[in-house]
Regions:
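N-terminal export/assembly leaders
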Residues: 25-28, 36, 99, 117-148
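Hydrophobic beta-strand residues in large extracellular and virion-surface proteins
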Residues: 9-11, 39-41, 59-61, 73, ...
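Short beta-strand-centered interaction patches in the first periplasmic/extracellular domains
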Residues: 2-5, 68, 75-77, 81-89, ...
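A broad, structure-centric signal for solvent-exposed, well-ordered loop/edge residues
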Residues: 18-20, 25, 31-33, 48, ...
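Surface-exposed cap/loop segments at beta↔alpha junctions
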Residues: 44-131
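A structural signal for short, hydrophobic beta-strand segments that form beta-sheets
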Residues: 20-23, 73, 197
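Juxtamembrane "anchor/assembly" segments of surface/extracellular structural proteins
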Residues: 1-54, 90-98
Length: 200
């Protein structure tokens, strides 16, 4: 699938790169964690996927040569019939991993945002999932916040960031950012239309 600027969307999952998608949906809002993404295709001459492509595999979604999403595949569905081969791969952004994890039980319920990130994201089981943490203003991270062991790690991080007057969001490369998402000016590009074929 190519858009009106002749750029292609590619998915890399496992050791396989897949292009030629018929439908691509990737929601992305700063204030909405665990946005959904979904890709589908149908080919008359398609082949079943190798074993390296499976649920819980890491993925990267490319727009031309630019990474626009790093995530983990939640679900992979294949269908084969006499008409051809169908494939659907879907999931959520990496915030979903932080939502699914609860804050571990620890001595003392007051903790700073910096300590929380070091202890539970960069040095915990999620270290292999979250690529890095970028903090715009480190001077505010000394404020402590009350954390309940039962609440999700994402909620705890977001609450601690709000105490410092900052927001939490994920970058396309899978790193976690804390600060003001609109601090740097951005340019609105030409509206993209995904069409197939190009001369449609």
């Amino acid at each position: 699938m190519r858009d009106n600027s002749n750029n292609e969307i590619r998915l890399v999952i496992g050791d396989v790169e897949i292009s030629g998608w018929d439908n691509v949906t990737a929601d992305s809002q700063v204030d909405t964690p665990a946005d959904n993404w979904n890709l589908t295709l149908f080919r008359q001459d398609g082949q079943p996927l190798p074993d390296s492509v499976h649920g819980a595999a890491k993925i990267q979604l490319f727009y031309n040569n630019e990474v626009i999403l790093t995530s983990i595949a939640d679900q992979i569905d294949e269908a084969v019939s006499r008409d051809g081969y169908g494939l659907q791969i879907s999931g959520r952004d990496l915030a979903g991993q932080l939502i699914d994890c609860s804050v571990p039980i620890f001595n003392g319920r007051q903790i700073t945002l910096e300590e929380m990130l070091q202890r539970y994201v960069l040095a915990g089981d999620l270290a292999s999932v979250i690529r890095d943490v970028h903090i715009q203003d480190n001077s505010w991270l000394k404020n402590k916040v009350s954390v309940e062991p039962s609440e999700s790690l994402w909620d705890a991080i977001a609450k601690a960031a709000q105490v410092t007057g900052q927001h939490v969001w994920l970058e396309p490369d899978g790193s976690l950012s804390i600060g003001d998402p609109f601090a740097n000016p951005y340019q609105v590009q030409e509206t993209l239309r995904l069409i197939r074929p190009l001369d449609n």
